[in-house]
Amino acid sequence: DGARAPWWRGGARAGFVGLGSAHDAGDLARAAVESVAADARRCLAAARELSGDRGLDGDGPADGLVMAGMGSTDPLWAEVLAGVTGEAVTTRRSAEAASAGAALLAASAIGWPVTLDDLNPFVAGTVPTPEVVERYRRWSANADRVAETLVDLDFGEGSDGGEGEAGSF
């Protein structure tokens, strides 16, 4: 319910802007993926600002993104994330990141010298092309303005997922 990072607005709602008669369900699905990627870009920018672009370990900026979980099995998701963030995206062999982590902990607990790369190696990388990054950069300027407006709209009583009709005026 609502918008999570980087917005943190519990009552926020989503919407599709700019739809035309030529758009179909596939366009809506891609727009949803692009929206999630845009929030990932916003979170990445906030993390870089807070860290002074030193990275989480203080040794310098992060070099690309790593996808884990079931979403990492979809090449389109990696392509969109790479294009929207402008970062290379790497995936691991198994989408079961939690299981690989549990196996790593178990192996470590009994003294086996195993690393995450042994259990679940990197297998694929998606490097964004300059053309795609530029297209998403232009798209992002509009998307950011729309998102900043949408998260602050007040849809009134019932827009919290309760009995009312969300978004009715």
Stretch-by-stretch model annotation:
Residues D1-F169:
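Glycine/Thr-rich phosphate-binding loops that ligate phosphate moieties of nucleotide
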